[in-house]
């Protein structure tokens, strides 16, 4: 979601969307888009760049306002909207406080985390206090990419969503896996946005890394493949015959979820994604039902009501 007050804070911080395009969002427009594409319910979230634009206090206030709005929308339109809480990272004290408020008081459905915060990827020891609390709560965590500081120095003219986003997610997933954080905090249900970035394509490469290099944990291939199957994956901007077969080879089939990236990706892309799932080779009716509905009901049992 991208309410007016968030977009204003975004602009005042001198930020721009990674596509360079203006974004319009209201709950009414969200419902119209959902209805037009046969979508019964959406889990809302604040995407990149999050809420921290350099001031800890302002970030706490903006996170609280976003989360309270998300809860309000869920109450106003029950059965149509859920939400992931946004946290004022990288400020850890504020993030832990907002996590408690959002999950205990507001009863939101989980948390969205950027793949990296202040240059530190998920799996970094500096972020472990947060992962420990998320693990204690068996929380659902959507991992969404951002623009790592290194991405901004490359000099490429192309919008960040085209390449840097999928690399950012992939770096976070690899760091979570090979740092051991994915196993240490095994109660967290991590969803990797955009089909896990390039992870499906390089999964075999990752599995043989211990054979090639002593710098990588010396794990057997199956342990690495099993780690990749622990993640959940959404289909935002990868719901095509090009990408889905690789994703289905990497992910557990019951851990693939429909994602749209709306409103940052226009409604036309939502329609293309729905058609892409229908037309992708190997996607049976049963698999498609899982991606479009059943797997989400497994992950979010409250949606059954």
Report each predicted region and the residues it spans.
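Mid-to-C-terminal alpha-helical segments outside catalytic/metal-binding sites
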Residues: 1-41, 68-76, 97-101, 188, ...
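Conserved N-terminal glycine/acidic-rich loop preference
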Residues: 140-143, 147, 167-178, 182, ...
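Acidic-and-aromatic substrate-binding clefts and catalytic sites of carbohydrate-active enzymes
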Residues: 21-25, 51-52, 89-95, 118-125, ...
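Histidine/acidic-residue-rich catalytic or RNA/ligand-binding cores of hydrolases
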Residues: 7, 52, 151-158, 196-211, ...
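Active-site-adjacent C-terminal substructures of enzyme catalytic domains
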Residues: 166-170, 181, 187, 211-212, ...
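Active-site gating/metal-coordination segments in enzymes
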Residues: 44-179
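Active-site gating loops and adjacent loop-to-helix segments of metal-dependent hydrolytic enzymes
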Residues: 1-25, 148-169, 206-230
């Amino acid at each position: 979601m991208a309410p007016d007050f968030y977009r204003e804070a975004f602009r005042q911080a001198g930020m721009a969307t990674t596509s360079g395009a203006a974004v319009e969002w209201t709950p009414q427009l969200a419902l119209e888009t959902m209805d037009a594409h046969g979508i019964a319910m959406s889990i809302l979230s604040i995407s990149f760049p999050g809420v921290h634009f350099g001031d800890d206090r302002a970030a706490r206030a903006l996170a609280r306002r976003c989360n309270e709005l998300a809860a309000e929308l869920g109450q106003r339109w029950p059965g149509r909207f859920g939400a992931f809480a946004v946290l004022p990272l990288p400020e850890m004290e504020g993030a832990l406080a907002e996590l408690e408020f959002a999950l205990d008081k507001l009863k939101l459905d989980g948390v969205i985390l950027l793949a990296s915060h202040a240059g530190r990827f998920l799996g970094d020891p500096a972020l472990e206090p947060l992962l420990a609390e998320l693990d204690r709560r068996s929380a659902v965590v959507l991992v969404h990419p951002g623009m790592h500081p290194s991405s901004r120095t490359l000099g490429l003219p192309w919008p960040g969503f085209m390449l840097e986003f999928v690399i950012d997610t992939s770096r976070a997933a690899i760091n979570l896996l090979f740092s051991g954080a994915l196993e240490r905090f095994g109660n967290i249900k991590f969803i990797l946005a955009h089909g896990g970035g390039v992870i499906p394509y390089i999964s075999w490469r990752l599995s043989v890394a211990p054979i090639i290099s002593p710098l990588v944990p010396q794990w057997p291939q199956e342990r690495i493949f099993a780690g990749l199957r622990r993640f959940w994956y959404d289909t935002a901007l990868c719901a095509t015959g090009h990408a889905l077969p690789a994703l289905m080879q990497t992910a557990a089939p019951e851990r693939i979820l429909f994602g749209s990236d709306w409103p940052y990706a226009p409604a036309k892309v939502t329609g293309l994604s729905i058609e892409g799932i229908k037309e992708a080779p190997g996607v049976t009716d049963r698999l498609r039902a899982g991606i479009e509905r059943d797997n989400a009901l497994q992950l979010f049992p409250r949606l059954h009501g």
